[in-house]
């Protein structure tokens, strides 16, 4: 698993996305959207992750060294759910390359060059894109399947 936070400038405001990327199939398994990059946003993202995570799971969860991921509350929540924290080396964005790749693809495919009337319109478009990305957008790395199709196919095999 990997996470990070990215910023969008929309209608003279800023919108922040905090997703969880499953490195097995590149599925976004939880995310939160906020108008400020605060600890509550990260806790909301974690709540979504915990709700979907099997009790027996013991994942490694990678992030950069952002202040949210160094916060004692964040680290406590991970430990309570048997998640091992992993952090990038200082100043090395390539350590979290899968997450950076997702953000780049997201911005090229649904943000750059687009005009949104309101922040709410943008958030709706972001929700729709994440659904599309997980369920419809195919990837050659996933044998021509979407992330959800690949996960489902792998479980059936």
Could you describe each region identified by the protein language model?
Residues 1-157:
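Charged DNA-binding/catalytic regions of mobile-element recombinases
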């Amino acid at each position: 698993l990997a996470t990070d936070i990215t910023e969008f400038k929309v209608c003279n405001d800023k919108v922040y996305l905090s997703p969880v990327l499953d490195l097995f199939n590149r599925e976004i398994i939880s995310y939160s959207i906020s108008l400020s990059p605060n600890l509550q946003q990260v806790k909301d993202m974690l709540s979504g992750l915990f709700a979907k995570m099997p009790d027996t799971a013991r994942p490694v969860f990678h992030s950069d060294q952002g202040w949210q991921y160094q916060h004692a509350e964040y680290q406590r929540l991970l430990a309570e759910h048997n998640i091992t924290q992993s952090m990038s080396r200082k100043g090395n964005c390539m350590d979290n390359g899968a997450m950076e790749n997702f953000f780049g693809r997201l911005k090229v495919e649904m943000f750059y060059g687009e005009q949104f009337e309101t922040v709410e319109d943008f958030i709706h478009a972001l929700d729709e894109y994440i659904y599309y990305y997980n369920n419809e957008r195919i990837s050659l790395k996933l044998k021509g399947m979407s992330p959800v199709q690949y996960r489902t196919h792998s479980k059936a095999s």
